[in-house]
Structure formats: C-alpha cells, structure tokens
Design a protein with these regions (language model features):
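Conserved catalytic or metal-liganding residues and their short signature motifs at active sites
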Residues: 1-244, 249-251
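Conserved small/polar residues in nucleotide/adenosyl-binding loops
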Residues: 265-266
C-alpha cells in the first residue's frame, strides 16, 4: 500500500514538473515572439500604466497576437515589469522581451527637426509646426515675442541667432526649448569664431561678424564663392563704402519684400 502511494505521488510530481516545464516553454516562446508589426511603430505609454493596462494596450493596438502569457512572463522576469512612461519606437523583428526591456530602460524614441542654412524665421517656424511630436507653443507669437523668449536683445530678430543643423528631440519637448538649443549652439559657435578671427578685420563686436556672415550667406548659395564675396564686402567696409548688396535691403524690408527686383527707391 505504501509503495502504491509513493508510486502515485511520483506520478503526480512528474506530471506537475512536466506541466511546469510545458508552461515555461510556452512563456519563453511567447517572450521570443516578434511583435505583430511590419514597419516602425510609435507607441505611447501613459504615466501610471500598470501591468494589466499595458497588456490591454498591446492587445488593443494588435502589437501582440495573444496576451495569454503576458502576465506570466512578467512574474517569471519581474525586471521586465519596471516599465517607464514615454514614447517609444518599436521596430520590425523586435520580440516581446526586447520590447519590455526597451520600456524598462526608459530610452524614448528620438525624432529629428532639420533646419537648413539661410532659412528665415518663418521657415524655422514651419519646420517646428510640422514636427508633430513637439509641444507647440509659438503659434501666433511675433518675432519680438520669440526673440524675448530666447533672451535675444530687444530690437533684434531671431534670424542669425539660431544655428542651422539637424536636432533630435523626444516627444513632448516644446518648440521654444528646441529653438533655445539652436540659440545656445549659435552663441558657442559665434564666440569660437570671434576668438579665432583675424584681428585685422573691420569688426568691433561678435554681432557685427555674425551680421556679415548672414549677409554673405544670403548673397550666394555657393559655398566656394563665399570667401570671395566676403573679401569684397570687407574691402568696402574698410574704405567706408556701402555694401550695395540686395540681402541688406531685403533684410531691412522684412516681410514687406515681395520677391521683386530691388531698385534705387529701396
């Protein structure tokens, strides 16, 4: 009788172990299953989202085909449950485990905004407006208001004070915060250029150097021609001659310039 009980108990233990192994295999297979996406997908995880709520979001957005093993995976690997709120980028081939590790890392998706040389403020504003993951706060703001927000002296335009480049940002960053980064970058570049300038050049302040650089940039779009154009303007300044260049007039006309040829009346 005792032997029979031991035999039955042994069978039960084997069955339990087999069931546990089967469950473990299922969980592992689920964890290594690729997300159900064919292209990059942006996923927003709201603050305060719990385990069950996350499962619901993933199933709702059809990112996982079957969430049956999701909670078991989080229990088996609790470090995967430490996910952080944010906006993330999921890529094709990413597995459920890799996705959870990304959410736990807090490494949010990076987006880009590209500003090209020679752009006017309205061009920068258009790029910002088209960047859908930015927080838009500048709508309806005048140049003077934007300049004030950037800490640019009254009476000066933001143009020329913003460094053209491709900037990365995370979802929720404000447009003015991005402009401030471009402004700080320009200030650093200007100070470096001023420190390394030829002291024989007729510029009294870094701002005068920046103004000339902006004029030369607008005078020619060909980089190879800029040194020659700059040389001509410098020589005119040295002899007290007017620059006689359209960009200086167009800049002064601002938004009133309609694209027509500049004449003596201007």
């Amino acid at each position: 009788m005792k032997k029979r009980k031991l035999k039955v108990l042994s069978i039960i233990v084997v069955l339990v172990l087999a069931l546990l192994f089967w469950g473990y295999q299922k969980i592992e297979r689920f964890a290594d299953t690729p997300l159900a996406i064919q292209q990059e997908t942006i996923f927003k995880l709201p603050a305060g989202t719990g385990r069950v709520a996350l499962e619901g979001l993933l199933v709702r957005d059809k990112l996982v085909r079957n969430g049956r093993w999701f909670q078991w995976l989080l229990k088996l690997e609790p470090e995967l449950a430490e996910f952080k709120a944010g906006t993330y980028r999921f890529t094709p081939g990413m597995t459920v485990r890799q996705m959870l590790k990304l959410l736990a890392s807090g490494k949010e998706a990076q987006f880009t905004a590209r500003f090209i040389e020679g752009s006017r403020l309205r061009d920068w504003q258009q790029v910002l407006q088209q960047s859908k993951y930015l927080k838009h706060t500048l709508a309806g703001k005048s140049e003077a208001e934007i300049a004030a927000a950037l800490g640019i002296p009254a009476g000066e335009t933001p143009e020329g004070h913003l460094y053209p480049d491709t900037y990365q940002y995370t979802a929720g960053m404000s447009d003015i915060a991005l402009l401030k980064r471009a402004h700080v970058r320009m200030n650093k570049a200007l100070q470096a250029a001023w420190a390394g300038r030829d002291t024989s050049l007729p510029y009294k302040t870094p701002e005068e150097l920046l103004t000339m650089a902006s004029i030369v940039e607008k005078e020619t779009a060909v980089p190879e021609e800029r040194s020659k154009v700059a040389s001509v303007f410098v020589n005119r300044l040295r002899i007290g001659m007017r620059l006689q260049t359209d960009p200086t007039v167009i800049y002064g006309m601002g938004e009133s310039y309609n694209g027509n040829k500049i004449g003596r009346a201007h």
